[in-house]
Amino acid sequence: MGIKLIVVLSILGQCAFAIDYDKDTCGLRPLINKGDSPPKIVGGVEAERGDWPWVISMRRNGNHICGGSLINDQWIITAAHCVYANQNPGVYQIVLGLHDRLIADNWVISRKVQSIIVHPQYSSQSLSNDIALMKLVDKIDTYTEYYMPVCFPRANQTFADQIGYTVGWGAPFHGGSLLRYLYEVTSSVLTDNVCKARYTSGMINPATQICSGGNSTGACQGDSGGPFIVSDPQRDGRYVLVGLTSWGIGCGDGGVYTRVSAYKSWIESKVGPTLS
């Protein structure tokens, strides 16, 4: 991977280096403190600035409504239920590099949306096929520590029993207000059998959905469309987009996510090859 030093910045009186990453870069967290242990959103902890460089804030009329992830220099992936009711791209704004939902740091950038593609088999009743793509009007010219794409999973990866991260500005409890700062929470990827037992009455299709464990942690209002990600040891710990936050029963009891690997062919038919 080529990394080119391009400029030296002074931030809060301290020197920091801005790095320009190749366009095939994905799933890195250059600013993470390597000594940090995983945190134990509902039950989560505030992320550090720049910890999750693919996470975006989707805005409508200036207000955060959903999360999403950068998957290349011009496309965002999110949940279909975030945009299904209003598919006019002109009403949305995508904000990248954001930590403080109310006050943007100087590296934060925003983009208008050119087009929206909702999965043709999305059901607003069952939330099946809860996946959508948003094309930005202007490309992201340069990947930096603060915004770069997430990696995609391979088709045969299940990640069962591995620790995953849900990231967003969602409410800390049911009925609560959005968080001001980006939060992260960890939970285990459940096996398909445990997932089906947890949500009865045929609510789960393991071929296209994945579940995370509860333990008083999970996504809530405002986290929808955001990433559920796992560090992949087979790829030097790069972070892989396993799921898109879709739904749950209340808050703090894990969640149900759209299984990204199940839609890889559909995604690539719209945006071209994904990064993995």
For each predicted feature, which ranges?
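Acidic glycine-/aspartate-rich tracts in secreted/extracellular proteins
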Residues: H81-A85, G97-L102, V137-T142, G170-F173, ...
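Extracellular/periplasmic catalytic domains that process cell-envelope and extracellular macromolecules
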Residues: E46-D51, L70, N86-N88, W107, ...
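Chymotrypsin/trypsin-fold serine protease catalytic domain
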Residues: Y21-N33, A104, I131, L136-D138, ...
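C-terminal subregion of chymotrypsin/trypsin-like serine protease catalytic domains
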Residues: G2-D20, I71-C82, Y92, E184-L190, ...
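Conserved H-D interstitial segment of serine endopeptidase catalytic domains
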Residues: L28, K34, M58-R59, I76-A79, ...
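Extracellular regions of mammalian proteins, primarily the fibronectin type-III
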Residues: S69, Q74-W75, N129-D130, Y146-M148, ...
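Protease-domain processing segments flanking chymotrypsin-fold serine proteases, especially trypsin-like
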Residues: G2-I77, V91-L98, S276
